[in-house]
């Protein structure tokens, strides 16, 4: 079985700034490989005007350069 981790970059409400949400999501992505996850998934928000990650491919490319197996 392959287990991946999805990072959604969603910060509406909750009292956190967009900057803090973004930093935390990047930290979660950094933990994927050390915790044994085999993939990182990005999310496209097709049906809402709100998104903090407008280019999922760029985000996944960023993590491809920071990991060895993912």
Tell where the protein language model's regions lie, with residue ranges.
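N-terminal beta1-alpha1-beta2 module of alpha/beta enzyme domains
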Residues: 1-67
